[in-house]
A protein has these predicted regions:
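Mature, structured domains of secreted/extracytosolic soluble proteins
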Residues: 1-351
Length: 351
């Protein structure tokens, strides 16, 4: 599939070449092949080259946005002249801690002697495909530079896999790095290559993350209105539960202007520890102590779950309807005045 040759089960292949003859040697064997085997390229190199008609620059830039550099003192000091006190370059290891595939590193396994045993999968959409995706799915953004790192992480992991993607996977479906089930349309494949660290597929249509079609959709496709709740959902690791495809949830979603600092009631306040590394926690104003309390992660998780009904309202003829939530409580839907509330008062917020 990746080498564009017809498979014959009676032959042995190596990187697209057919092995014809085995010659015994003192310390192993020598194999003759029917053609020269060129060194495999990494996923990074494949995307950097692109094709004559297509470029993967936008996707590659998003991957680079999610990289981390770690200073490698051993490699730096091993350079010629370093021991003599000469000035040498500082060398760094590049990693992608939030992605399931490392497009740069060619030693992908836990044991650094292994390479292809721990192959990953990369499915890169072309620039044109991503521009179309931006205009149709994320129209409130002018470019991918405006997306938060978390949204980029979801997008990129949706185009990666922990395991190689083979032709059988394309036919039957597979799970991507965002834990979504994916069925690729073979008609959307414009390039395929077997790389040194992953299988590579170029696409003329981007894969839409399932979260963009779930009740969490407003958190990701709108801009500047639900940033607090999106950060809270990610902070509490609730995303996988809220994007279940076989559920029928009702998400009663407060916007930033209703709960945050400023015009909001201060019932959900984000406190940034390190904006560059996206490290933060949450507080809420306590009316009793007249001070801010820091949310424990589990407490905030329960609070969010109590905004999500296990089913949408049904009895529109009734004045009030009680909906059970994922957090175990009930939401009261008042059809007379169009409001939604909990079943008890809260000490948080001043609104």
């Amino acid at each position: 599939f990746y080498f564009n040759i017809e498979f014959n089960p009676n032959k042995i292949y190596f990187a697209g070449a057919v092995m014809n003859e085995q010659i015994p040697a003192e310390n192993g064997s020598i194999y003759k092949t029917d053609k020269v085997v060129m060194p495999l390229k990494s996923a990074e190199e494949i995307m950097e080259e692109g094709t004559q008609q297509h470029s993967y620059d936008i996707f590659l830039d998003m991957v680079y946005n999610l990289s981390e550099l770690k200073y490698n003192s051993n490699a730096t000091l091993a350079q010629p002249g370093a021991e003599q006190g000469l000035e040498v370059d500082s060398l760094f290891d590049v990693t992608f801690p939030d992605l399931v595939a490392n497009i740069h590193n060619e030693l992908t396994g836990n044991n650094r002697r292994f390479t292809t045993i721990y192959h990953r999968g990369v499915m890169a959409p072309t620039d044109q495909a991503l521009n179309t995706f931006l205009s149709t799915t994320l129209p409130e953004y002018n470019s991918y530079d405006e997306l938060s790192l978390k949204i980029k992480e979801v997008l990129v992991n949706s185009h990666m896999t922990r395991n190689p993607v083979y032709q059988s996977d394309i036919l039957t479906g597979f799970t991507n790095g965002a834990e979504d089930s994916v069925m690729l349309d073979p008609g959307n494949i414009i390039q395929k290559a077997y790389g040194s660290n992953s299988t590579f597929i170029g696409l003329d249509k981007a894969i839409e993350p399932r979260v963009f079609n779930s009740v969490c959709r407003p958190l990701y496709v709108t801009r500047g209105r639900f940033e607090l709740m999106r950060a809270a959902v990610e902070y509490t690791n609730l995303l996988s539960a809220l994007k279940k495809s076989n559920a029928n949830y009702g998400f009663y979603l407060p916007n930033d202007f209703g709960v945050g600092v400023g015009t909001g009631d201060s019932s959900l306040i984000r406190v940034d520890v390190n904006k560059e590394l996206d490290i933060y926690y949450f507080e809420a104003f306590n009316m009793g102590s007249e001070a801010n309390d820091r949310y424990a992660r589990n407490d905030l998780r329960r609070k969010i779950l109590n905004h999500i009904a296990v089913s949408p309202p049904r009895a529109f003829s009734a004045s009030k309807e009680f909906l059970r939530t994922l957090g175990g409580n009930y939401l009261v839907v008042n059809h007379d005045n169009g409001t939604v509330s909990g079943t008890s008062t809260t000490k948080y917020g001043f609104g």
